[in-house]
Structure formats: C-alpha cells, structure tokens
Amino acid sequence: LSSLVSKGYIFLLIKIFYRVLDFDSVISSHMVNILFAFGVVGMIMGSVAAIKEKNIRRMTAYSSVAQIGYIYMGIGLGTTAGVVAALFHIISHGAMKSLLFISISGLTEVSDGRSDYLSLRGAGLRNKVAGAAFTVGSLSMIGMPLLTGFISKYLFAAAATTAGSKMITAWVVLAISTVLNTMYFIDRKSV
C-alpha cells in the first residue's frame, strides 16, 4: 500500500504545475531545476543506502527513495516527455514495489520471520512463488528489458534527449543508478 500512497503528493505536484501554475511558468521560474537536482541526489543517495543495508525490507524501502528520485528527475527535465516518464514510473514502481514487499513477506515467512540476507539464503527454493515474484520485481527495478522498469528507464532516457543541458547528466545518472540498483538487488555476496 505504501508503494502507491507515497506518491499521492507527486500526482498533486504535477496537477498544481499543470493546472494551477502553468507548466511553462514553472519551467521559466527554474523550479524544475531544483526538482531535477533533488531527483539526481535521491537516486544516488537512496541507492547507496540500499547497498549498505543488511535487512531486505529496509533495503527495499531505501530503494523507494532512489525510485522517487527518478520521478523527480523526470519532472525536473522540464518537458512533457519527462512528466509522462515520471507518471509511467509511478505506476510501474507502485506495482513492482508492491510485488517485492508481498514476496518478501513470503520469503521471510519460510525463514522463521527473519529478514536479514543471511537468514534468507534458500528462501526462494522453500517458497518458489515468492522467490519467482521477488526475481521478477527485482529484475524490473533494475531495468531488465521487456519489464516495466526497463520501459520507465527508456522513457526517462528518451525524455532526456529533449531536455537540453540536462541530457548528459540524466543519462549518466540513469546509468549509475542502474548499476547501483543491480548491486543492491542482485549482488549480495558481501552482505
């Protein structure tokens, strides 16, 4: 539920930008530059915090900070394509994060209620449905082709091509964030 509710204020922000303030005046006031900066920082900081986390529930929550950073970055591009990418990501992230949290419950259930990574070893074999669901959710969050996370990242990258001076920054941060996402969703050997 929190994966959907936590984005209600972003819908409100977009509505205010388009209906109350007029998006062109928001762009000319450079408010979108602040959102872009917050988005970029959120993407990196949330991912770094998720990598350091040893508890799967908290790691997934920190991942949400990074994913909300994507949304702010998209709005901060200051283009309609960026807002469309952000809206798609809200839906994609809401669905995949819900899938992740539900599957985590199934995995911890077969691990005596423990949610640290060491206790979860083999949990996907003990609860195959939860293991498969977690795999799909993780791969989508990373941006595996054909999954909604990939479509989101593609939309952000495409929107960045029309964002002028923000294009290179957006592309670089998208690439770095994707690598960081992979580190906290797949590479957990060092935890």
Regions found by a protein language model. Name each.
Residues 191:
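Conserved small/polar residues in nucleotide/adenosyl-binding loops
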Residues 1-188:
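Hydrophobic transmembrane alpha-helices and their helix-loop junctions in integral membrane proteins
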